Amino acid sequence: MSQDIYDYANKLERAVRALPEYRKALEAREEIKADEAASQLFDEFVAVQEKLQGLMQTGQLPTETEQADIQALSQKIEANDLLKGYFNAQQALSIYVNDIERIVFAPLKDLAK
C-alpha cells in the first residue's frame, strides 16, 4: 500500500504537467528566456524574492529603500507583457496546486482536530 501512494503522487505530477495552464506557463517562461530584457528582469525578480524570503525567515522587514526598489521592480514587471503573461499563467496554474494541496493535506488537518 505504501508504494501505491508514490505511484499516485507520480501520476499527479504527470497530470499537472499535462494541464493546459502548465503548458501555457512553460511556454511563457521560454518566451522570457528568449528575450534578454525580460530574462534580466525575471532574474532580478527571483533575486529580490529570495532576499525577501531570507528576511522573513529571520523576522526582519525590508528597509524603506528595499521597499522602494521592490515597488520599482513591480512596475517594470507590470509593464513587460512577457512577464505579465508568465505571472498570469502561473496564477491560473496555482488554482490547481492550491486545490490539490487542500485535498492532500486534509487528512493531516483532521488529525489536529
Swiss-Prot record:
Protein name (record): UPF0342 protein SZO_10960
InterPro entries with a match to the protein in the record: Com_YlbF (IPR010368), YheA/YmcA-like_dom_sf (IPR023378)
Pfam family, one: Com_YlbF
Taxonomic lineage from the root: Bacteria, Bacillati, Bacillota, Bacilli, Lactobacillales
Species name: Streptococcus equi subsp. zooepidemicus (strain H70)
Similarity section: Belongs to the UPF0342 family.
Domain of life according to the entry: Bacteria
